[in-house]
Swiss-Prot record:
Secreted effector that suppresses pattern-triggered immunity (PTI) in plant host. This is Secreted RxLR effector protein RXLR-C02. Keywords: Host cytoplasm, Host nucleus, Secreted, Signal, Virulence. It comes from Plasmopara halstedii (Downy mildew of sunflower). The gene is RXLR-C02. It is found in: Secreted; Host cytoplasm; Host nucleus. Residues 54-75 are annotated as: Disordered. Transmembrane segments: none annotated. Residues 1-21 form the signal peptide. A motif (RxLR) lies at residues 48-51. Induction: Expression is up-regulated in spores. Belongs to the RxLR effector family. GO terms for cellular component: extracellular region; host cell cytoplasm; host cell nucleus.
Length: 92
């Protein structure tokens, strides 16, 4: 009887605090939202990296095209490239 009373008190306190008897069920939509945000960020970064390599003439043509230093995406790509070269990774 005491255990039953403890369980009912815990559920009542949880409901009063959160508006739901099982507050952990609210986590599932947040996980889906987080996964969507991560996938969106990854797709954005991959698209940006591909654009940078195309703009710099590394994909599809042999011309030596240059990008001004004011272009933040070009700066980001150059930083990525120098970091990889410094630590010994082979660049595409």
């Amino acid at each position: 009887m005491q255990f039953h009373l403890l369980v009912m008190t815990t559920i009542a306190a949880s409901f009063a605090a959160t508006g739901s008897a099982l507050p952990h069920t609210n986590v599932l939509p947040k996980i889906g939202t987080l996964r969507g945000a991560i996938n969106n960020d990854a797709a954005t970064f991959n698209g940006r990296a591909l654009r940078n390599t195309e703009n710099r003439g590394l994909i599809g043509d042999d011309s030596d095209s240059s990008i001004s230093d004011s272009d933040s995406e070009a700066k980001e790509y150059r930083a990525y490239k120098s970091h990889k070269e410094h630590f010994g990774y082979q660049m595409p």
